[in-house]
């Protein structure tokens, strides 16, 4: 005898701002509490009204939608906060938990300053889901959002995190994944890395290995979908990171990418193929 699915609980609408997580892929991951709050919402503030509109339609929910992203002017946030004084206003992102590399920080800060109650309606989060299945140390982790697009900025950000004794968690796009893996391999060739993609969807995958090995795999098999990139913490005996970009630039001033990669490989012990790929990126920058 199969158990009946629980019904959506009754909820007495209470004024305030509700930060509500939505599914990151599998629509079955919405919570009963989230559905109850959405059904009673006076207003749903969202990144994209089309995306949220489709989501609500799937659950049979009708709601008034207000586009609100990081570019929204102060007067739009002020109107949303005024509504939250009168009834329940929900903030959602396109997928996952709002404010985790998504808009909403300014709205929450201003709502709290205005004395509006802010409540979390928890649910899916890609960063936490990836950490849970990657097999990397999870007792301490640092979520750092998206890696910068520019090579120099990306390298500087990674170097700044070199001494963090925790698993590093990033969001990344499919087109930039291989470049980011090359950058990580140049700094931390021995660290364990995980690439989690299409989380909760049909083709969910979590692949682990060195950054160089993963870069080679995804160069041959270009990925699709949303990606979470995780880097394990440094080993206790890990030597200070050398600035390989500086070494490569100096070598490139005197030689071509192949020879420059060979020279730096001898000096650092980093895989020549990884350095060669990075040398080509620097030469084309």
Language-model regions, residue ranges each:
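General beta-strand structural signal in soluble alpha/beta enzymes
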Residues: 46, 93, 118-123, 170, ...
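Conserved helicase motor
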Residues: 66-74, 147-150
């Amino acid at each position: 005898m199969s158990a009946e699915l629980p019904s959506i609980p009754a909820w007495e609408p209470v004024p305030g701002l509700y930060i509500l997580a939505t599914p990151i892929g599998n629509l079955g991951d919405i919570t009963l509490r989230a559905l109850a709050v959405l059904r009673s919402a006076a207003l749903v503030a969202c990144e994209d009204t089309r995306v949220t509109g489709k989501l609500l339609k799937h659950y049979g929910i009708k709601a008034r939608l207000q586009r609100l992203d990081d570019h929204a002017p102060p007067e739009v946030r002020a109107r949303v906060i005024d509504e939250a004084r009168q009834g329940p206003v929900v903030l959602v992102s396109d997928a996952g938990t709002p404010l985790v590399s998504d808009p909403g920080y300014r709205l929450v800060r201003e709502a709290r300053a205005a004395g509006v109650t802010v409540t979390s309606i928890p649910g899916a989060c890609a960063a936490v889901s990836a950490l849970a299945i990657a097999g990397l140390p999870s007792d301490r982790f640092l979520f750092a959002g998206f890696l910068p697009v520019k090579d120099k900025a990306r390298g500087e950000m990674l170097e700044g995190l070199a001494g963090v004794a925790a698993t590093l968690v990033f969001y990344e796009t499919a087109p930039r994944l291989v470049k980011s893996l090359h950058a990580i391999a140049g700094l931390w060739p021995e660290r364990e890395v995980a690439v989690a993609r299409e989380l909760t969807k049909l083709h969910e995958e979590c692949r682990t290995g060195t950054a160089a090995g993963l870069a080679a795999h995804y160069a041959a098999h270009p990925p699709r979908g949303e990606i979470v990139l995780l880097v394990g913490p440094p080993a206790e005996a890990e030597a200070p990171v050398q600035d390989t970009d500086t070494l490569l630039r100096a070598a490139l001033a005197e030689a071509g990418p192949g020879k420059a990669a060979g020279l730096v490989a001898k000096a650092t012990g980093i895989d020549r193929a990884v350095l060669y790929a990075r040398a080509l990126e620097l030469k084309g920058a």
